[in-house]
């Protein structure tokens, strides 16, 4: 999923009665992941997502080790036509794609007044986890069962000073 792009297309239609060009929005909707990041902390204030210390690498002097505290911040965009009940799930897997944490699930509802897309912000706070070995771990975001984003967490052997 890394580096995957979603393109929105508009189609042109010519009507015999009105030969002017008409732009039509696509009829297929896709939830868009605007932000999905591992960070030191995150908050929402006045509808704004505030992220402190986004990172993708941690080091440990020895293994196994514990990472005591972090957060994962997520901002999704829903288009008109995607109203209703949804659920999201966050998975954290080791380099062999085995779960490090139990999947964390949240149910929510999207309401779209008018014709403007809406965002949903979710923050998983106070995450702590146990890491057996160095390697490339993954946080994966699923919306309604579909994988929307996967980000790496690089766990490395820290250099002694």
Q: What are these model-predicted stretches?
A:
Residues 25, 29-134, 138-161:
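Contiguous segments within soluble domain cores/interaction surfaces
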């Amino acid at each position: 999923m890394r580096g995957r792009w979603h393109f929105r297309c508009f189609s042109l239609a010519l009507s015999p009665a009105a030969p002017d060009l008409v732009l039509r929005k696509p009829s297929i909707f896709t939830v868009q992941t605007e932000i999905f990041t591992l960070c030191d902390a995150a908050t929402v204030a006045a509808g704004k997502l505030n992220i402190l210390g986004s990172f993708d690498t941690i080091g440990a002097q020895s293994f196994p080790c514990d990472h005591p505290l972090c957060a994962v911040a997520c901002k999704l965009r829903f288009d008109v036509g995607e109203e209703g009940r949804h659920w999201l799930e966050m998975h954290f897997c080791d380099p062999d794609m085995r779960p490090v944490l139990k999947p964390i699930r949240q149910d929510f509802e999207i309401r779209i007044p008018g014709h403007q897309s809406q965002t949903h912000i979710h923050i998983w706070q106070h995450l702590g986890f146990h890491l057996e070995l160095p390697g490339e771990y993954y946080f994966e975001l699923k919306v309604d069962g579909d994988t929307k984003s996967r980000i790496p967490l690089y766990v490395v052997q820290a250099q002694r000073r």
